[in-house]
Amino acid sequence: MSDHFQLKSHFKPAGDQPTAIAQLCEGLEAGLAHQTLLGATGTGKTFTMANIINDLNRPTIIMAHNKTLAAQLYGEMKEFFPKNAVEYFVSYYDYYQPEAYVVSSDTFIEKDASINEHIEQMRLSATKALLERRDTIIVASVSAIYGLGDPKSYMKMMLLLKVGEKVDQRDMLRRLAEIQYTRNDVDFSRGTYRVRGEVVDIFPAESSTFAIRVEMFDDEIERLSIFDPLTGAIEKHIVRTTIYPKTHYVTPREKILGAIEKIQEELKDRRAQLLSANKLVEEQRVTQRTQYDIEMMRELGYCSGIENYSRYLSGRTPGDPPPTLLDYLPDDALMIIDESHVTVSQIGAMYKGDRSRKENLVEYGFRMPSAMDNRPLRFEEFEAISPQTIYVSATPGDFELDRCVGAIAEQVIRPTGLLDPLIEVRPVGDQVDDLLSEIYKSVEKGERVLVTTLTKRMSEDLTDYLSEHNVKVRYLHSDIDTVERVEIIRDLRAGVFDVLVGINLLREGLDMPEVALVAILDADKEGFLRSARSIIQTVGRAARHLEGRAILYGDRITKSMAKAMDETARRREIQHAYNIEHGIEPHSLAKKILDSMDVGEEAGPKDNLRLIRKESKKVLSAKEITVQIKQLDSKMHAYASDLEFEKAASVRDEIHELQQQLIN
């Protein structure tokens, strides 16, 4: 373990990178709160980020706008910093249905969730690293702005063990129960402990590879060891250790009792309000639900939906921001917001969506008004609590440009000498046939192709058409989960197929050096998917290939197209001049095809639709088919009740296939 970052790379900063690194580091040292790294696609923005982290030597959080990009960044940062703590913090839900009330049909939907235990372990590992180490990098999604347990309560509940310390074994086991560890002498797994005479084995909640053995003699800790929970082999003896709570939401007993008093006071006031408004059903509902929760908290220390009482458990006043991952960051931390033109707006949107759902729950007596404070941060709260920030994007948004006037580091030169892709405009009339001929040419040269369309229907039809013409093609759509999306991108790079079709899923941050051609169909249809920013991002997917080019199909050149083409031409001019001046011969980027998403593979959801589909393709017995049909039937109804009708229809088709197998 080191207090200093140790960057490992075969490359040195090149092109614009040294200038950008120096400018941003100087700005941070000078105390600038906001800076922007405007880096063209393929210029090595991630490597620049890694060098800034290494030179600055401060704990860092990198925020991405989705799990796919976060997984890619996590994999790259782990490569750059193998000896430091690189952690991953995203939502641990494989499936999440928040509680909601549909007024029109008088339907209450209970909270339902499937938690990915591997991701939960990585979240706990992330906060542990922040509390214990300076050399920590957290790669996070917008999950970082959602309520998390209060860090003060969390730290207060930690169990410290030292060799030679006097401790009663029963007291130690009681403390383990308080931090929600469960005793299991048979199945020793994460978040459990087992007792064998005077030996207590503890499997830390934040660990996947090691456990702690506490050996006692009478009432004294005689030895502490780290061992492999699978083989039982002792790895090393230690002098002290800290056992962290099993969940971030653990709360000391006295705080729970104090919170119960305040909850009862609020319940009394709320009942009076509802009765005075003659809302008898709502009054009965909120009384029954809240009193049940109070009894659970009093007896067990927690209840289902305890996060709805987080205002009282963390000692906040009404309207105060909830504690989040950002509260675990030290004061001198650094924040990097990747693909900021998307991530910033996403952070701002989280609060509004959450609030509208909660208002119904409160109004109709399913929750008390204090539940409104269990929420993500508002954007202004996020800004207030954020440390010094660097926004990273090839196309920064207006927000970043306004905040960073005079503090923008431009990175246009690629270390590989590659120029921005050539852009060509062709008519829409025969776009599909023209595209097919271009695909044939590219595939013959061993290149990959990305095609982006405007609608899901067109993507599906185009995929079918290309497939009928012997093109190895896949369609990337919104129903595909995070893990499978990464697999599809990896398969494209590996040459399992040659063409990937999508709508707006092919833009930010996807790193595919094998892609030489990007085709944008109906590029002259102005709108969000065909804005200048979107076109620049999409065209940028071909910027890592020597033969990189883009075809925009349109019967006219819109303002957005013109702006994107002008910016690309400007960059090409700068890049070409630099290459001539320094005698650089452009070459394609060679990058290993890594499985950066091993963060999600280990504990993928067993009921994942993708896995069920794979299973359904196998030859199954009649009994197995019947069991699968039952599983899929319940899943179909669940999707339908969540108004996810496309997924429900997809599951229905799977059921029909299985029923056909059963008949045959």
Curated annotation (Swiss-Prot):
Subunit note: Forms a heterotetramer with UvrA during the search for lesions. Interacts with UvrC in an incision complex.
UVR domain ranges (all copies): 626-661
Motif residue range(s): Beta-hairpin: 92-115
Superkingdom, natural source: Bacteria
Sequence positions that bind ATP: 39-46
Pfam assignment, any one: Helicase_C
Protein name in UniProt: UvrABC system protein B
Any one Gene Ontology cellular component term annotated for this protein: cytoplasm
Organism (species): Pseudoalteromonas translucida (strain TAC 125)
